[in-house]
Amino acid sequence: MACTTILVGKAASYDGSTMIARNDDSGSGHFTAKKFTVIHPEELPKTYRSVLSHVEIPLPEGTLRFTAMPNAVEGKGIWAASGVNAANVGMTATETITSNPRVLGADPLVEYQPAKGEKPEVPGGIGEEDIVYLVLPYIHSAREGVLRLGSLLEQYGTYEMNGIAFQDVNEIWWLETIGGHHWIARRVPDDVYVVMPNQLGIDTFDLEDAFGAQENYLCSADLREFIAKNHLDLSLDGALNPRDAFGSHDDADHVYNTPRAWYMLRYLNPRTWVWEGADADYTPMSDDLPWCMVPERKVTPEDIKYMLSSHYQGTPYDPYLSYGDKSAKGAYRSIGINRNDFMALLQMRPDQPEESRAVEWVAYASNAFNTMVPFYANVERTPEYLANTTGTVATDNFYWTSRLIAAMADASYNKSLFHLERYEEAVLSAGRALVNQYDAKLAAESDAARRAALREEANTAIAAMLQEKAADTLDKVLFELSSQMKNAYSRSDA
């Protein structure tokens, strides 16, 4: 899917957490209803069959419970998308990325071929529909997640190019697929953050480490031979740049991808480089924007939400620009776009006990008009307000309420913006207050069963707060838009 990802190492975050976050976006002209749920080991089959590619994969024993963001409407696969398992390992998948004809000609994508005449069908590989479901219930560390997914890619292949993030309390790893069966992965340095639009991003790779100590780099078993045989290394100095070797530098990237990376890097490092003007080090169309940077200050969840909601505020490219030169207005693809399905920010807090370490921040619909809210991830069930999404528009769940707020606020932007700013701050503040309150209760409780009940009680309280504030905001935004109707008239009846 068309998405945007941010990864924050533990030394770059405000509290020592590892944080991984992704906007999950539908393709143009589509919207996908999502629900926040828990998948239990007994719900997993012995053999997995993909709806889209028809590939069948036997699943191992020893599964773990995990949270997920599956599609609310059945029929096109699970698309679990993002979650945290019972071992406090987080995963988000996938960020659709780009490739080039040299790679795809050497290792074609493994696409499903339907039966034709007397020829039987040929299953395809794995894809975004499948990846979280196939990996997250079976791993106990971020590195283990890379190795399991890498093994599946080598055995079954994939029909699309994807980037996938894994985290535990100590590490974050980022994996990128290369062609049908190859892959690379890099450990995110502790003191940096990573920004990822929809293109292959890793810009340095140490093959010696990947085939040696494997401290910071991992890859498919025959990657070195694959590169040499197909003349993929374009460097003049022998330092492999995966972005040049395996990625793209298309004109479309300069409208759809590089501007997003430019804006996020500019936000966290405004003084490190010159970002605008004739003497700019980097522009929205630069192909060499860094994959990772050390931020100028520590990064908070609120920073991540702002970046993943952005539409180039403060630049000539803002689609909501209402003054000055508007010639570049809306020139680039926004990060907070109309077709954001959800955003999940997974936070592993090192200063909390393992049982309550993982917090999952959730937002639905267009990030430019929503708010995110924290929930304890180590639970048996999620609140109904976030889990009861269906394909029918309704105001008794967070997904559809968020969609309605976004559509109406977009149409009444200048009038509704302050309602949205107050809504977001109120939910973030109240959500943090409730987590702080229940962290203290959990620390004081010695009984494990009671602590489990407290985590679910906390999530219920957070959801109740959220539902009240979302309904209030919907009411206010509806009023603003109703007041702008074309059949309005200023005189009241006598």
Regions found by a protein language model. Give the residues of each.
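Short Pro/Gly-enriched beta-strand edge/turn motifs at strand-loop
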Residues: E61-R65, V146, S322-G330
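Histidine-centered catalytic/metal-binding microenvironments
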Residues: A426-A494
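Short, conserved catalytic/metal-binding motifs centered on acidic residues
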Residues: I6, G145, A344
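Secondary-structure boundary elements
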Residues: Y138-L147, S151-E160, G314, P350-P353
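A contiguous strand-loop segment
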Residues: A2-E128, R148-A280
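Glycine-rich, aromatic-lined ligand/substrate-binding cores of catalytic
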Residues: E225-D351
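Substrate-recognition/cap regions that form aromatic- and gly/pro-loop-enriched pockets
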Residues: Y312-Q313, Y317-A444
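Second-shell loop/turn segments in exported
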Residues: E118-E121, I131-I139
